[in-house]
Swiss-Prot record:
Post-translational modification: The N-terminus is blocked.
InterPro entries for this protein: GLR_AS (IPR011767), Glutaredoxin (IPR002109), Glutaredoxin_euk/vir (IPR011899), Glutaredoxin_subgr (IPR014025), Thioredoxin-like_sf (IPR036249)
Biological processes, Gene Ontology terms: cellular response to oxidative stress
Protein name per its UniProtKB record: Glutaredoxin-C6
Record bears the keyword Transmembrane: no
SUPFAM superfamilies with a match to the protein in the record: Thioredoxin-like
Record keywords, A-Z: Cytoplasm, Disulfide bond, Electron transport, Redox-active center, Transport
Cellular component terms per the entry's GO annotation: cytoplasm
Cystine residue pairs: C23-C26
Short name of any one Pfam family annotated for the protein: Glutaredoxin
Amino acid sequence: MALAKAKETVASAPVVVYSKSYCPFCVRVKKLFEQLGATFKAIELDGESDGSELQSALAEWTGQRTVPNVFINGKHIGGCDDTLALNNEGKLVPLLTEAGAIASSAKTTITA
């Protein structure tokens, strides 16, 4: 049931970040998306009644147990390091633009 819920959530928005409110790596990724002007859906696992079940389902689905767990256009991107690396390589904005999360006139990278 948690896996179905996770997949449904990922399909419901161009960008989904599974997060924990106290996690500094999660804050960093969400701040980057905000700086880029990207719209995203953040699911705070520590605020969800089934948060631990969702985190286990995400680990089963993606092989990643840690947060943040980032999805763009339904595709698993990874965590904080993966997302920052895509940004540093100039690949994040095109992914976000293709997903419809930002307008195509946005900056190409933000130094985090």
